[in-house]
């Protein structure tokens, strides 16, 4: 089956046919954030939603076992890793050899209700979630119906 293939941090592949509804980032044009989120949302030809969230980093670590890594994968540091880790190299006087790999999650939701619920943090929609839903509602009638219509008893 030809189509779109996305892979999470564990190597699990999700393959589907559909269209990209939104691709957004919390990064800035001047790349001044040490950590940011990239999010892509597709609607499959069958009507499900595929969400890929990638937490990305520009932090250089001096110690491969730095506690701020939280057990996540590391890689060789690159020129893009412009922020020194405040935990293992706060003064910048140690050579920073390691960068943190992106953490990528891929989830599939069978309904717009499930998708909207998945965008909540601690049971509430964040500013980012609301902006995503506003953009998504312009492209998907099912999301528009749920998101832009509030029914009050």
Predicted features by range, described:
Residues 3, 60-63, 71-84:
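Intrinsic disorder
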Residues 20-49:
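Amphipathic, interaction-prone secondary-structure segments
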Residues 1-30:
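Short, charged/polar N-terminal "headpieces" of proteins
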Residues 13-15, 36, 101:
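Short, mixed charged/polar active-site loops
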Residues 76-84, 89-153:
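Low-complexity intrinsically disordered segments
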Residues 31-35, 57-58, 145, 150-153:
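Exposed acidic/polar residues on beta-strands and adjacent loops within beta-sheet cores, strongest
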Residues 46, 54-57, 62-64:
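Predominantly late transmembrane helices and immediately cytosolic-facing juxtamembrane segments
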Residues 44-52, 69-72:
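Amphipathic alpha-helical interaction modules
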């Amino acid at each position: 089956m030809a189509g779109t293939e996305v892979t999470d941090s564990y190597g699990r592949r999700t393959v589907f046919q559909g269209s990209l509804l939104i691709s957004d980032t919390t990064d800035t044009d001047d790349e001044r954030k040490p950590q940011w989120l990239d999010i892509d949302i597709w609607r499959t030809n069958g009507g499900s939603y595929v969400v890929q969230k990638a937490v990305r980093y520009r932090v250089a670590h001096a110690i491969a076992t730095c506690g701020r890594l939280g057990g996540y994968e590391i890689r060789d540091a690159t020129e893009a890793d412009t922020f020194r880790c405040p935990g293992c190299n706060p003064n910048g006087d140690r050579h920073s050899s390691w960068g943190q790999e992106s953490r990528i999650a891929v989830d599939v939701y069978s309904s717009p209700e499930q998708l909207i619920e998945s965008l909540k943090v601690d049971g509430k929609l964040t500013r980012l979630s609301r902006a995503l839903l506003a953009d998504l509602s312009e492209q998907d009638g099912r999301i528009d119906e749920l998101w832009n219509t509030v029914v009050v008893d």
